[in-house]
A protein has these predicted regions:
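Polybasic, Ser/Thr-rich amphipathic helices
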Residues: 161-178
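Secondary-structure transition/turn motif
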Residues: 39-44
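Long, contiguous binding/interaction regions
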Residues: 2-10, 14-35, 46-50, 54, ...
Length: 180
């Protein structure tokens, strides 16, 4: 009995810039033991494989950069990078779109093969440099304006709440007479 199976192939239409001209291309994503990417641009085919799709995309980009081809997808943007947990726990099809000074959140996740604007493209080196800078930069959580409470508001709220005398509460509780 043969238990082998053909890996499922997902095809995506993407754009590339080749020597300054935008061209259409097809990405094929395959996942079995490893993650493989095959890019067909005109009559040329480039392929790569790795433990996860982020690694395969990085290997593919190395080949493309040698041929002056820019793949226009989110995974090629300067401020897009996966967290170590994404790399360790899955196929790394998503990564965070990061902003210097801010913590990456779930709503910042993007599909790395979604299209990007040509102006957002960055080389692997530029992307790695941004990620290193993001890691070194102190970060804060962005709070939504409508529900954020300032420290002053929290202090005022604390002052207006009646304080219970817990000693008095427990003293009367033991006698069965509650006051609190």
């Amino acid at each position: 009995m043969d238990y082998s199976f053909e890996p499922e192939i997902e095809k995506l239409n993407v754009s590339c810039i080749i020597n300054g001209v935008v061209d259409n291309a097809v990405l094929e994503l395959q996942e079995d033991n490893d993650c493989r990417i095959i890019l067909t641009v005109g009559n040329n085919t480039y392929s790569s494989g790795a433990e996860h799709f982020w690694g395969a995309l990085t290997e593919l980009r190395k080949q493309l950069e040698e041929h002056n081809i820019k793949l226009l997808c989110q995974g090629c943007c300067m401020n897009v990078y996966p967290s170590p947990m994404i790399l360790d726990m899955g196929d790394a099809r998503k990564a965070y779109k990061m902003k210097l000074g801010y913590t990456a959140k779930m709503e910042d996740l993007v599909f790395i093969f979604d299209p990007c604007d040509p102006d957002d493209y960055a080389s692997i080196e530029e992307q790695d440099r941004f990620y290193d800078e993001w890691k070194r930069t102190p970060r804060i959580l962005e709070k939504p304006n409508d529900s954020a409470k300032t420290d002053a508001n929290l202090k005022d709220e604390h002052k207006t709440k009646p304080k219970k005398n817990w000693f008095q509460f427990w003293k009367h509780k033991s006698t069965g007479k509650q006051t609190g």
